[in-house]
Amino acid sequence: MDMSGESSIKRRRSSIAASAERPAKHLRPENSTLTPGDATPANGTVYAVEDEGDAGRMMPIGPAQADSPEWQATIENVVKSVVSIHFCQTCSFDTDMSMSSQATGFVVDAERGYILTNRHVVCAGPFWGYCIFDNHEECDVRPVYRDPVHDFGILKFDPKAIRYLELTELKLRPEAARVGSEIRVVGNDAGEKLSILSGVISRLDRNAPEYGDGYCDFNTNYIQAAAAASGGSSGSPVVNIDGHAIALQAGGRADGAATDYFLPLDRPLRALQCIQRGEPVTRGTIQTQWILKPFDECRRLGLTPDWEAAVRKAAPQETSMLVAEIILPEGPADGKLEEGDVLLQVNGELLTQFIRLDDILDSSVGKPVRLLVQRGGQNVEVECEVGDLHAITPDRFVTVAGGTFHNLSYQQARLYAIATRGVYICEAAGSFKLENTLSGWIIDSVDKRPTRNLDEFIEVMRAIPDRSRVVVSYRHIRDLHTRGTGIVYIDRHWHPKMRMAVRNDGTGLWDFSDLADPVPAAAPVPRKADFIHLDGVSQAAVSDIVRSFVRVSCTMPLKLDGYPQAKKTGYGLVVDAEKGLVVVSRAIVPYDLCDINITVADSIIVTAQVVFLHPLQNYTVIQYDPSLVQAPVQSAKLSTEYIKQGQETIFVGFNQNFRIVVAKTTVTDITTVSIPANASAPRYRAINLDAVTVDTGLSGQCTNGVLIGEDGVVQALWLNYLGERTPSSHKDVEYHLGFATPALLPVTTKIQQGIIPKLRILNMESYVVQMSQARIMGVSEQWIQKVAQANPARHQLFMVRKVDCPPPQYSSTADALEEGDIILTLDGKLITRVSELDTMYDKEVLDVLIVRNGEELHLKVPTIPTEDLETDRAVVFCGAVLQKPHHAVRQQISKLHSEVYVSARSRGSPAYQYGLSPTNFITAVNGVPTPNLDSFVREVSKIPDNTYFRLRAVTFDNVPWVVTMKKNDHYFPMSEYIKDPSQPLGWLTVSHDRDRHKDGITPDQANLNPDAMDEAFEQVSDVEPDVE
């Protein structure tokens, strides 16, 4: 978009995902659906998935022309000082999301080991990275300084670690930047480690570019040139023919124009000298943004001819003056300066340049300065107290209840012209995922108590018990006119720690400390409520069924099983009010590592637990404590007869506003379907089910509901089914289909009797074949006649489409189904309906009659216990979520390479940085085989912190590869979740790094934010957008 004429500005930071040094064989492609078209439901609805970023459009880069011998000699010396920086911001902070990327820097002090690069490379938040020199020696780097405003920072490395290269440094010569000077940009352009781009300086007085909502430099001029650099060249030195660094590459245009913007080196040189002398880098501010405006604009603002003449005489080369653009409320200049004031003098000195203004303010922290401005042709002199710029730049943050908070920064305040006051959510996750937006919220109050700053927020949060629901008042920084009010559920059980992180410039790390243990949850109390009455609805059955619905909200603290979301809400149907049993879609409650809250009558909120997860048919049975609900909840009556095509029924559903809608309709079709498999990452999907569709447009708008008869008996559940992710838009398809209630009864009846069903299934997926196909494949006329008699409504048989990869103990059997087998009978019963496959649920071995290659065969096929297919353990290591391959993986793969499967990974983690992707299998650590999680945990526990190790991995498509990774226990300690019914949460949390940290580590401290995790590789940039 255009921003005051500065259109399509980009920062130069590269994504590691597109590295040219290794083909992307370790990534799972997103190609197409994997289910035959005739078995795919037709009413899929596409829902947006939060993409992590957008790489933007990059222009083609032309090579530099052949250089003169002088330039060649210069470049040969310069490249020895240039380094490629690979780095992560391990968690979101201020304007930046957690991410992994590449950039450039250059050595400015070879003796002490200082590297100059951009501030958006050094990161405002926790940084972790390393640099690679021209001879491919590698060295860890840590931040020693990042400027609060200007786009530069300084990293430090150990010069003694570089053994094979004679270190050289580039001299900073800011005064050598002149219009018309020929320059070279030497850096890691487009992630290619070393590129040399040529250009000519065209301007020295450009205002700092605006990058949009993220970090932006201001209160400095920029140098403009035509060099056509791109992502990864951030921090590159801009050198002249003498080999001196005269500017720092920072940004450029992304609209095809070969225009780049360089930061002058005056203030970086001053900061470097302060650090070399061991002095603090003082930074002063009056919280005012100034911009350069040419004399013609200044005249329109009221610059008098006398002052213009004085300025032109004192500085004949000047064509512009500094004009106040933004004065922050409650700042030193508030009420004294006004927007449009033309700056004339500071402390009696005529002043027209940013550099001198910075110099005066930086040397006057805590002291007053006198400013003379012209306002509408009148001289106005004001005195302002110079504040400390570091004091209004956050250097600490707090994580609590899954969210991350710090004081509002000067960067954000300047961008939106607001006071530098308030608590800012830089990672709106966990309890504080407000309005489904990841960041940008300012918290005004929590639990009816004001939170004007981070300290007040901490004191308020200390006192709130676990599982409390409190009122939060908030505003989004982009819309401060609108104050939102919401109720948040405080989670201090999955996220028990309230932690403070404080930046330590001495070590380059952020030091963590615990602030408060969670206050135990209050005992729940019974509450009363009444259900709504539907006015104008003539059917009495509808009024009764309202009392059988409850709203179900499921929150997942960790991404498992390829599930793409961290929170899902929908409706469930009460099947036993006395026992508190509810049936809900498995697209809402996908696994039992979660918090479930149900709302009864839109009034009473109680917790629930998972009782049963169906492995194939997309429903979950959950249970709440009915003694806490004093409301006339009614058990739904489930039909024992299957609903039929053409039958009249009443559709009762809930739309996207959670409002109940009703329509009389007709069943249009009942089709055997399988939900399409997700190509990029396997995840739970329903297979082998009869889907009911109805003749009403409401069915596509409602995710949950029922089909009922006039007598109020529920004939089918209306459920949402999670489908595939579209490769082009990276959005999830969700199907809305009916599921006949007789298929529920065998399970719900047992649960009502206190028996948890332990189903057994055939490890295969089937789909329908018509008689014309069956005859060609060898089914005899006799069997075709039997099919016609057994199922007059649908003449069909089932063919094995895919045989699942079984658990190891069931992998060797002589009698096994194969792809292409047509199933005739199970234990002597002809199979023409999906419901007839249910005979497998309680049989260890089935007598199966099939047609294979035109011949009838009798097989003794063992079934698989479904409890072996559900996830009961997860290990989080270096930001990767590892688990045993879940059922969806076994459904889509033919061979398991190991039982260490990468299910998800966190942004900004070593797993992300080094390319360990979801759907990979880890088979060995440092050459030692790791067939299961126990062996993996044992081997990686031997690896010291900050040490490289080798992982041998195999992709989902059977391609082996090796990844080298560096362990990071400080930001990503190893932790583990183990299913344990004896625990209050049903899961035991374990840390394997407790002995390395005196205060102990829990999984809550391991950056386990599901909203910052990818469960599938997305073909987009893995950093924040370069193009705004």
From Swiss-Prot:
**CDD domains with a match to the protein in the record:** cpPDZ1_ScNma111-like (cd06786), PDZ2-4_Nma111p-like (cd06719)
Looking at the record, which segments are called Serine protease? 82-266
Entry annotation: catalytic residues: 120 (charge relay system), 151 (charge relay system), 233 (charge relay system)
Question: Per UniProt, which keywords does this protein have?
Answer: Apoptosis, Hydrolase, Nucleus, Protease, Repeat, Serine protease
| Entry-linked InterPro entries | PDZ (IPR001478), PDZ-like_dom (IPR025926), PDZ_6 (IPR041489), PDZ_sf (IPR036034), Peptidase_S1_PA (IPR009003), Peptidase_S1C (IPR001940)
Question: Biological process (GO) annotations?
Answer: apoptotic process; proteolysis
Cross-referenced SUPFAM superfamilies, in alphabetical order?
Answer: PDZ domain-like (SSF50156), Trypsin-like serine proteases (SSF50494)
- Which Enzyme Commission number(s) are on file for it? 3.4.21.-
Q: List each coiled-coil range.
A: none
Tell me a Gene Ontology molecular-function term this record carries: serine-type endopeptidase activity
User: Which cellular compartments is it found in?
Assistant: Nucleus
Task: Give the similarity note.
Answer: Belongs to the peptidase S1C family.
Q: What is this protein called?
A: Pro-apoptotic serine protease nma111
Biological source species: Aspergillus clavatus (strain ATCC 1007 / CBS 513.65 / DSM 816 / NCTC 3887 / NRRL 1 / QM 1276 / 107)
- Gene name of the record: nma111
